[in-house]
Every structure is written in structure tokens, then in C-alpha cells.
């Protein structure tokens, strides 16, 4: 991924865009594992963010090639906590580290719902 579309006039990545990078990485992971968020939505199910905690270490700049490393720290029937890092592809420099708490809900009731078994399996 390139940080090119997410930069300030000063040529550094705007702080809020690191949340977008985290989101893209989680979405790509689901897609790569054949979990369709649009299909979940048709079944009145969705992922929602309960909390995000980010520590900014350095600013990514225009032209930096980055990737996001993600791991599930903890999971329960309706909640997962991800540790995520935005890292430079060329020199492994860390730009930001984050902890993201994701819940699974029923869109009609707006209440937590158990993850489907196939989804839980990909996080083992």
C-alpha cells in the first residue's frame, strides 16, 4: 500500500488515516478468507469498532511503502481485540501501533451477536 493518497500538505500522513490503514488491513484479511462483509450485512450482521487506541511513533511520508501487521490478541464469542502496526516495507520502521476492539452485532437489535463459526475458525 502507498501512503500517497493520505498525506497532509506537509507531505506526511494525517494522523487519523492510520485508523483507515488498520481498517483496510482487517477488511482485506476477511476478504482473503472469503468472508464477505456485504453478505454479513444482508444477514443483518456487522463488525463495529468499540475502541481504538493508537500510539504514534513516526510520521509516514509521501512515497513511503507501508504494510499493516495485524494479530488477534484476544477473542470471545462476539468481540476481538487486534494488535496492529503500520510498518515501512523497506526498512521495517514502525509508524504507529494500535489496539482495536471489534465487536460483532446484529444490525436490527444493535446488540452483540456470536461470531459465525466459520469466522471464528479463521482466527485460530
Predicted features, each with a name:
Residues 31, 61-62, 73-124:
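HotDog/MaoC-like acyl-thioester-processing domains
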Residues 16-18:
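Early exported N-terminus immediately downstream of N-terminal targeting peptides
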Residues 29-67, 71-80, 98:
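Hydrophobic beta-strand-centered segment that forms part of the acyl-chain substrate-binding groove
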Residues 1-8:
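Short, small-residue-biased leader/transition segments that mark boundaries at the very start
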Residues 25:
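Helix-loop element at the rim of GNAT/NAT acetyltransferase active sites that forms part
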